[in-house]
Amino acid sequence: MLIIAHRGNYKGVCPTKENSVEALRFCLERGWGIEIDIRRTPNGEYYISHDPSILNKNNHADVYCHLFRQYPDRIIALNLKEFGYEIELIEYLNKNNITSQVFLFDMELIEPEFGQTAKLLRQLDAEIKIAARVSDRNEPIERALSIESASIIWLDEFDNLWLTNDDIQKIKEARKVIYAISPEIHGFPMGQVYQRWEQFYTWGVNGICTDYADELELTIKSWLG
């Protein structure tokens, strides 16, 4: 199972370190994937930040791309926070030689028409990996599976732990890779988190995105004996 460190968090949320090069490097060295957010300044430069911010030497995307190239087999989940520069983004990823590592997701939260961005991204680059969203907020499995260009399904449980084994098997039958958000990211207590981790593992989910990457790794090792 792939462990994806949410914004580079690995021992819980750490606002002073999350999304930092230091934290991400630690995660990549551990063999984990990472989830980060990419944004663009008005003059066309890219930076890594969950919230809109001011470009500086520490958050400039060039610095992160240099880091990622040192770990070419690691998976980077790239959350698109803005709409309208897809052509330039694909060019940027290709120029920095990290396209094979990343998959793009969360376009549905910002696009004016469902599936529009995934279709455009596929037209721009036949190899770029795309994830479609599924959640308990009017984002059903059937809709996500209708995005033919998406090889990955990104599962969210905002208000309820609603996913079942049948849901996972339905997605697997469609031959999609499945990554799930860990419950603590949406405020669920750790008791439910551990239970959900075990269920996801048993059901065959391919990866979990969590703020507790270190604990998830230890937990998986305990299951394996």
Each language-model region and where it sits:
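Phosphate-group recognition and catalysis centered on beta-loop-alpha active-site segments
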Residues: 1-225
